[in-house]
Amino acid sequence: MSSHHTNPRSLLNAATHSLIERVHRAGRPPMAAMTPAQAREFYDIGGPMLDLQPAPQVDRVEDISLRARDGHTMPARLYAPRCETALPILLYIHGGGFSVGSLTTHDVLCRQLSRLGHCAVVSLDYRLAPEHRFPTAVHDSWDALNWLHQNGQTLGLDTTRLAVGGDSAGGTLAAVCALMARDADLPLRLQLLFYPGCIARQDTASHHTFAEGFMLDKATVDWFFNNYIDQADRDDWRFAPMNASDHAGLAPTWIGLAECDPLVDEGVQYADTLRMAGVAVNLEIYKGVVHGFITLGRAIPDALQAHADAGRALKNAFER
């Protein structure tokens, strides 16, 4: 798709335009002007106010902990519908620029994916930057996936049916985990990627077109990445999965993108790269919406369609 547009604001649908206007009028302070602790608190409190309310009902919601390679205990939350047989597992890795986000900010989304995908969802609270810079989040995500593969049965889950997913920075981490899983011969049914970051440098047309005024702005992207990674590491495929030497043999892939998002072009490029490598890819581009819309369901109803599409992709992958 081409992200060159003379009036990109005209692409926004009515609900998204209204939300952006309300946020602008509210004088929301930019994350880049906050400390990481302030930004996390702001997102934890403010984010859920724009998501579906009340939170969708799921039969089983349980806080658990997973073990990282250095002995760190990673908090996680298990969501599961009632089922007589062992459920398949989606490891979900939240977005937030590797710097913010939590089990709280993505609670509604994980409930939706569990309900609609008829699967267990394990939401991971991985360590954040700048306190824990690259590649800690990669290690935590991969360690969690391995833990579930080896120990998921202790939670009553089916470890032979495993998927990984995430949004934004979490989508990057999920894509990296899918590459690692292929190399480790750990079979995945699906990688589920909402607007993932895929490239080393943010220089696509969409990064210029949607740099300001579309929820995720350039200053915030720069702040996130300065928190997380040194310039010398930017070409590492564990930050930029597009840079992996080979994409053949990856799990079937579902990618959901927002049309008015700085990251949309790299998401399309990644889908094309996977297809060229022979990977089965289902790409959905949601018109008129912005980065982060899947956790803004109260404000942007298109989130519900994306939830349904992703849930269907999970269900189909686990039933194959």
Predicted feature locations:
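Alpha/beta-hydrolase active-site loop
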Residues: 132-153, 310
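Short amphipathic alpha-helix adjacent to the substrate-entry channel of hydrolases
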Residues: 104-123
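Short beta-strand/loop motif that positions the catalytic acidic residue
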Residues: 255-257
